[in-house]
């Protein structure tokens, strides 16, 4: 499957919400409504031995069922109306207790031998909402259930849609996101960042041209 190197339109920190046009990322414990960017988990995954890894998404009928299937690099969350087991593992991995296999997203480029953390978010954005210009401390990927997003980077633009190719962005490059189309965007998002680096940070060294506004 072809992979689009794209990113989510949210700057998130586990301890401090970051301001942006259209909203901020908050811990899910502070949730007051549906729309927004909500940090649902932020956990260490340990040292990654290889230069690439994969994000595995499995759904289960109950939290207990998902927990029974969880491996050492798995996280159980409730988001977007389902119970999820989200795992960082090699290509082709499957949990010990079978659930509904939803997606296997990757490869995610990482630095072999480095320690990593996984930050997971539930994102619900209305068309027209945008991000601040930002970058990540490791690869980012998302699983989109609905909606459309336009990414602008120094290299141009890309469009990510529900039902399309896997969307991933490597750590480092600056980016600016706009929720486009007519449908509310609903997605699960992963930032797999080096433990010594922040998940996200503002990027002041590049200014977007607004290429997504005309789409």
Regions found by a protein language model. Name each.
Residues 22-24, 30-31, 42, 137-156:
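Glycine- and acidic-residue-biased ligand/ion/polar-headgroup-sensing regions
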Residues 2-8:
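Sec-dependent signal peptide recognition
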Residues 71-72, 78-83, 150, 171-198:
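Ligand-binding loop in jelly-roll beta-barrel domains
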Residues 38-41, 118-136, 157-162, 166-174, ...:
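Conserved short histidine dyad/triad with adjacent acidic residue
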Residues 8-17:
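Hydrophobic h-region of N-terminal signal peptides that target proteins for export
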Residues 23-97:
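N-terminal accessory interaction module
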Residues 79-84, 88-129, 187:
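Flexible, surface-exposed loop/linker segments and immediately adjacent secondary-structure boundaries
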Residues 28-32, 53-67, 113-115, 125, ...:
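Short acidic-glycine-tyrosine-enriched beta hairpin
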């Amino acid at each position: 499957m072809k992979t689009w190197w794209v990113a989510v339109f949210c700057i998130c920190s586990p301890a401090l919400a970051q301001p942006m046009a259209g909203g901020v990322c908050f811990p899910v414990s502070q949730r007051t409504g549906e729309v927004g960017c909500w940090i649902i988990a932020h956990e260490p995954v340990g040292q990654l031995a290889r230069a690439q890894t994969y994000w595995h998404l499995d759904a289960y009928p109950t939290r207990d069922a998902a927990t029974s299937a969880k491996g050492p690099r798995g996280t159980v969350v409730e988001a977007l109306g389902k119970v999820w087991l989200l795992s960082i593992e090699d290509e082709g991995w499957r949990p010990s207790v079978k659930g509904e296999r939803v997606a296997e997203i990757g490869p995610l480029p990482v630095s072999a031998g480095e320690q990593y953390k996984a930050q997971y978010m539930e994102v619900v954005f209305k068309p027209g909402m945008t991000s601040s210009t930002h970058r990540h401390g490791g690869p980012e990927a998302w699983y989109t259930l609905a909606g459309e997003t336009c990414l602008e980077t120094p290299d141009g633009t890309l469009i990510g849609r529900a039902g399309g190719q896997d969307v991933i962005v490597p750590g480092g490059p600056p980016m600016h996101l706009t929720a486009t189309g007519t449908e509310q965007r609903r997605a699960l998002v992963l930032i797999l960042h080096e433990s010594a680096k922040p998940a996200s940070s503002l990027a002041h060294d590049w200014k977007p041209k607004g290429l997504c506004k005309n789409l």
